[in-house]
Amino acid sequence: MKHFITCLALAFVALNASAQTLWRGAPMNASPAEIRALMPEIQDTSPAQRALDRGALLQIPSTLIADEDFAVTYHFEAERLQRIHLHAKVPTPARTQTLLRALQVTLRTSYGLPIGTKARQDANALPGSVDLKWAFRRMTVQLQMVDGTTVNLTYATNIPSRPAAL
Protein backbone atom coordinates (compact mmCIF):
# COMPACT_ATOMS: atom_id res chain seq x y z
CA MET A 1 0.00 0.00 0.00
CA LYS A 2 2.88 2.35 0.82
CA HIS A 3 4.35 1.80 -2.68
CA PHE A 4 0.98 2.50 -4.30
CA ILE A 5 0.64 5.83 -2.47
CA THR A 6 4.22 6.75 -3.39
CA CYS A 7 3.60 5.94 -7.07
CA LEU A 8 0.35 7.90 -7.03
CA ALA A 9 2.09 10.92 -5.47
CA LEU A 10 4.91 10.78 -8.05
CA ALA A 11 2.41 10.55 -10.90
CA PHE A 12 0.59 13.60 -9.55
CA VAL A 13 3.85 15.58 -9.30
CA ALA A 14 4.84 14.57 -12.85
CA LEU A 15 1.50 15.73 -14.25
CA ASN A 16 1.79 19.09 -12.54
CA ALA A 17 5.44 19.54 -13.58
CA SER A 18 4.63 19.75 -17.28
CA ALA A 19 5.83 22.89 -19.01
CA GLN A 20 3.40 25.76 -18.73
CA THR A 21 3.06 28.01 -21.71
CA LEU A 22 2.57 31.72 -22.06
CA TRP A 23 1.11 33.12 -25.30
CA ARG A 24 0.70 30.88 -28.39
CA GLY A 25 2.38 27.89 -26.80
CA ALA A 26 5.66 29.63 -25.87
CA PRO A 27 7.02 27.65 -22.90
CA MET A 28 8.05 29.54 -19.78
CA ASN A 29 11.82 29.80 -19.46
CA ALA A 30 12.37 28.73 -23.09
CA SER A 31 15.56 29.88 -24.77
CA PRO A 32 15.50 32.25 -27.76
CA ALA A 33 16.45 29.29 -30.01
CA GLU A 34 13.48 27.28 -28.73
CA ILE A 35 11.12 30.19 -29.43
CA ARG A 36 12.57 30.64 -32.94
CA ALA A 37 12.00 26.94 -33.66
CA LEU A 38 8.43 27.15 -32.38
CA MET A 39 7.50 30.31 -34.29
CA PRO A 40 9.10 30.65 -37.73
CA GLU A 41 7.71 34.18 -38.24
CA ILE A 42 9.68 35.53 -35.29
CA GLN A 43 12.49 38.06 -35.83
CA ASP A 44 15.28 39.59 -33.79
CA THR A 45 14.44 42.97 -32.29
CA SER A 46 16.24 46.04 -33.59
CA PRO A 47 19.47 47.21 -31.95
CA ALA A 48 17.63 50.39 -30.90
CA GLN A 49 14.95 48.37 -29.12
CA ARG A 50 17.56 46.19 -27.42
CA ALA A 51 19.37 49.35 -26.27
CA LEU A 52 16.17 50.46 -24.51
CA ASP A 53 15.39 47.00 -23.11
CA ARG A 54 18.25 44.47 -23.10
CA GLY A 55 15.83 41.60 -22.47
CA ALA A 56 13.69 42.32 -25.56
CA LEU A 57 15.39 39.88 -27.93
CA LEU A 58 12.66 38.63 -30.27
CA GLN A 59 9.55 40.06 -31.90
CA ILE A 60 6.67 39.48 -34.23
CA PRO A 61 6.16 42.94 -35.76
CA SER A 62 2.56 42.35 -36.76
CA THR A 63 -0.05 39.73 -35.90
CA LEU A 64 -3.84 39.94 -35.98
CA ILE A 65 -5.74 39.32 -32.76
CA ALA A 66 -9.49 39.97 -32.68
CA ASP A 67 -9.19 41.86 -36.00
CA GLU A 68 -6.58 44.30 -34.66
CA ASP A 69 -2.86 44.49 -35.40
CA PHE A 70 -0.53 43.73 -32.48
CA ALA A 71 3.25 43.94 -32.18
CA VAL A 72 4.62 41.14 -29.99
CA THR A 73 7.90 41.34 -28.05
CA TYR A 74 9.54 38.41 -26.24
CA HIS A 75 11.53 39.40 -23.15
CA PHE A 76 14.28 37.17 -21.76
CA GLU A 77 16.33 37.15 -18.59
CA ALA A 78 19.49 35.04 -18.49
CA GLU A 79 18.48 33.63 -21.92
CA ARG A 80 15.14 32.37 -20.54
CA LEU A 81 11.70 33.64 -21.59
CA GLN A 82 10.14 35.67 -18.79
CA ARG A 83 7.53 37.87 -20.47
CA ILE A 84 5.61 38.34 -23.70
CA HIS A 85 4.26 41.82 -24.37
CA LEU A 86 1.57 42.44 -26.99
CA HIS A 87 0.93 46.06 -28.00
CA ALA A 88 -1.78 47.48 -30.26
CA LYS A 89 -2.49 51.05 -31.27
CA VAL A 90 -6.16 50.91 -32.29
CA PRO A 91 -7.44 53.65 -34.66
CA THR A 92 -10.60 54.60 -32.74
CA PRO A 93 -11.84 54.46 -29.14
CA ALA A 94 -14.91 52.49 -30.27
CA ARG A 95 -12.74 49.77 -31.82
CA THR A 96 -10.57 49.80 -28.70
CA GLN A 97 -13.62 49.07 -26.54
CA THR A 98 -14.66 46.25 -28.90
CA LEU A 99 -11.15 44.78 -28.69
CA LEU A 100 -11.09 45.06 -24.88
CA ARG A 101 -14.43 43.27 -24.58
CA ALA A 102 -13.23 40.46 -26.85
CA LEU A 103 -9.95 40.07 -24.95
CA GLN A 104 -11.67 40.14 -21.56
CA VAL A 105 -14.10 37.39 -22.62
CA THR A 106 -11.23 35.24 -23.88
CA LEU A 107 -9.10 35.83 -20.77
CA ARG A 108 -11.98 35.16 -18.39
CA THR A 109 -12.77 31.95 -20.26
CA SER A 110 -9.14 30.82 -20.04
CA TYR A 111 -8.15 32.08 -16.58
CA GLY A 112 -11.35 32.87 -14.67
CA LEU A 113 -12.12 36.15 -12.97
CA PRO A 114 -9.30 38.70 -12.71
CA ILE A 115 -7.48 38.83 -9.38
CA GLY A 116 -7.40 42.58 -9.41
CA THR A 117 -8.19 45.82 -11.09
CA LYS A 118 -5.85 48.70 -10.43
CA ALA A 119 -7.41 52.08 -9.76
CA ARG A 120 -5.65 54.66 -11.88
CA GLN A 121 -4.26 57.61 -9.97
CA ASP A 122 -3.21 59.38 -13.17
CA ALA A 123 -5.24 62.55 -13.72
CA ASN A 124 -4.83 62.09 -17.49
CA ALA A 125 -6.37 58.59 -17.49
CA LEU A 126 -9.59 58.39 -19.44
CA PRO A 127 -12.80 57.21 -17.86
CA GLY A 128 -13.14 53.55 -18.72
CA SER A 129 -9.40 52.89 -18.50
CA VAL A 130 -8.66 49.21 -18.02
CA ASP A 131 -6.01 47.56 -15.88
CA LEU A 132 -6.94 43.93 -15.16
CA LYS A 133 -4.73 41.14 -13.89
CA TRP A 134 -5.16 37.37 -13.88
CA ALA A 135 -3.06 34.76 -12.09
CA PHE A 136 -2.91 31.23 -13.44
CA ARG A 137 -0.56 28.61 -12.06
CA ARG A 138 2.89 30.16 -12.39
CA MET A 139 2.05 33.14 -14.59
CA THR A 140 0.21 36.43 -14.62
CA VAL A 141 -1.68 38.04 -17.47
CA GLN A 142 -2.28 41.78 -17.50
CA LEU A 143 -4.63 43.67 -19.83
CA GLN A 144 -4.29 47.46 -19.95
CA MET A 145 -5.80 50.39 -21.82
CA VAL A 146 -4.87 53.86 -20.65
CA ASP A 147 -5.16 56.45 -23.40
CA GLY A 148 -8.27 55.29 -25.24
CA THR A 149 -6.53 53.65 -28.19
CA THR A 150 -3.50 51.76 -26.85
CA VAL A 151 -3.99 48.18 -25.63
CA ASN A 152 -1.25 46.22 -23.85
CA LEU A 153 -1.50 42.54 -23.02
CA THR A 154 1.37 41.02 -21.03
CA TYR A 155 2.00 37.38 -20.16
CA ALA A 156 4.68 36.97 -17.48
CA THR A 157 6.17 34.12 -15.49
CA ASN A 158 6.00 34.03 -11.71
CA ILE A 159 9.07 31.81 -11.44
CA PRO A 160 12.66 33.03 -11.35
CA SER A 161 14.86 32.40 -14.37
CA ARG A 162 17.63 31.12 -12.08
CA PRO A 163 17.72 29.98 -8.47
CA ALA A 164 18.27 32.65 -5.86
CA ALA A 165 21.62 32.58 -4.10
CA LEU A 166 21.60 31.69 -0.43
Residue ranges and their predicted role:
Residues 19-57, 87-166:
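Non-cytosolic coordination micro-motifs
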Residues 14-16:
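N-terminal signal peptide c-region/cleavage motif recognized by signal peptidases
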Residues 59-103:
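Mid-chain, structured segments of secreted extracytoplasmic proteins
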Residues 2-8:
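Sec-dependent signal peptide recognition
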